[in-house]
Amino acid sequence: MFSFNESDLGIDVLHTPQQHAEFIKEFGEYLAKLNLPTKMLLGDNSDATTFDFILPAMKDNSTHKYIGAISFHSWRGCDDATLAKWGEAAKQLNVPLIIGEGSTDAAAHRYAEIFNESTFALYEINLYTRICAICQPLSILQWQLTSDYSLLWGDGIYRSQGPLRPTQRFWNMKQLASTPEEALSIPVTSSKKNINAAAFGNIARGEYAIHLVNNGADCNATITGLPKDIQTATVFITNTKDSMTQSTATVKDGK
């Protein structure tokens, strides 16, 4: 896949929406003439709110055969309606949606202590859960799995002391990434506004995952609509005290 990173913003190539469409068409045709399989990435936007940047290419049918995926970066977050637009765009072109840079605050490295705070971890996993539920991306590429924007702390990372150790963000990512392979998104709703949910399932293998993010006080949760043949569920809890702490829940009559 080929793209100029965040060309809606100009880092470091600046396109207008129409120029972006023309580039996809002309460079895509050039690659095709060279018999290269490389496809073009539509968007790769600096955040989700600049959705209109991809509209000229969406409306120009001659660009579609060169587009391999649609992408936006999740910086700064956005509302549910905007996320839904990206999901619908991917469905319209029948290509995957990729979150090309995943996290919430591109400037956070300037005040890096925030990476070790639970509030930052909660905001980030909330956004990822909403993205998974609403626009169903093929992949969220975490920015980034290095010492920069690190999911780890200690050993001098941003001058932090002590041994290298995982932060709450690490366990959030690990828990989300534990979704079964080749699982498809399943519709899920929550009766409480302060709980975000996303569900996945691989029906052929009988593997399912339900991710819940609680933004309120401790509470009991009842999940309904599970397959009738499931008798137990493995539960993982991550918060300021628990790091994917595992337990087993009994399932009866699909709940």
Describe these PLM feature segments:
Residues M1-S3, K39-L42, G68-F72, P96-E101, ...:
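Structural recognition of the beta-strand scaffold that forms the well-ordered cores
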Residues F4-G10, N45-T49, S74-C78, G102-A107, ...:
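Solvent-exposed loop/turn segments at secondary-structure junctions
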Residues E29, K33, P37-L41, S62-R110:
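Glycoside hydrolase catalytic-domain groove-lining segments
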Residues A48-S62, F120-I131:
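Short, acidic/polar
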Residues P96-Q175, P180, S185-I195:
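Aromatic/acidic polysaccharide-binding cleft in carbohydrate-active enzymes
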Residues T189-Q231:
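Carbohydrate-binding surface patches
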Residues P227-K255:
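Acidic, Ser/Thr/Pro-rich beta/coil linker or hinge segments at domain junctions
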